[in-house]
């Protein structure tokens, strides 16, 4: 699927998706930040857009009003790393693995449980990976980091 892809400006896609979702971010008064290093990937634009939209939408939904939401896109070696760090409740370790399967949803059970499964399929198709990590501070969970790593070439 990736072989016939033209190069896509991932940083522009990330900014565009953040702009699309800005009404939801504003409605929840989230403490939002975005840092995106200019990176071009050999991937279809729609795949990167869908990946980013699903991750960001999940983060917006699970971050409490006024909470932090940070998106970072950076080059790490020969890979692009997209991190969506929310201020939500995190996930239980056994649930984290199941969230990448269709029709599994996390806390609150809202949605159909397809977003992260779609993200997983897209990252696999692009030769990358996706991981979920609870962020801890003083022994308690203060948010979830969704980390996508994709090859730059």
Language-model regions, residue ranges each:
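Short helix-loop "hinge" at the ATP-lid/N-box region of the Bergerat-fold HATPase_c
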Residues: 59-60
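Short beta-strand/loop element within the Bergerat-fold HATPase_c
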Residues: 66-78
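Acidic ATP/Mg2+-coordinating residue in the GHKL
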Residues: 86
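Short conserved segment of the HATPase_c
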Residues: 91-103
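Short alpha-helical Gxxx[C/S/T] motif in the catalytic ATP-binding
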Residues: 115, 119
């Amino acid at each position: 699927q990736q072989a016939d892809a033209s190069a896509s400006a991932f940083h522009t896609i990330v900014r565009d998706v953040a702009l699309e979702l800005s009404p939801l971010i504003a409605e929840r008064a989230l403490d939002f930040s975005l840092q995106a290093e200019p990176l071009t990937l050999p991937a279809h634009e729609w795949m990167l857009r869908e990946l980013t939209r699903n991750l960001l939408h999940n983060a917006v939904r699970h971050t409490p009003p006024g909470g932090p939401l940070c998106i970072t896109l950076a080059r790490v070696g020969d890979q692009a790393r997209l991190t969506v760090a929310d201020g939500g409740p995190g996930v239980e370790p056994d649930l984290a693995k199941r969230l990448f399967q269709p029709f599994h949803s996390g806390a609150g059970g809202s949605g159909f449980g397809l977003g992260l499964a779609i993200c997983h399929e897209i990252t696999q198709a692009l030769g990358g990976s996706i991981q979920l990590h609870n962020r801890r501070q003083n022994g308690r969970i203060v948010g979830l980091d969704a980390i996508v790593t994709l090859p730059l070439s």
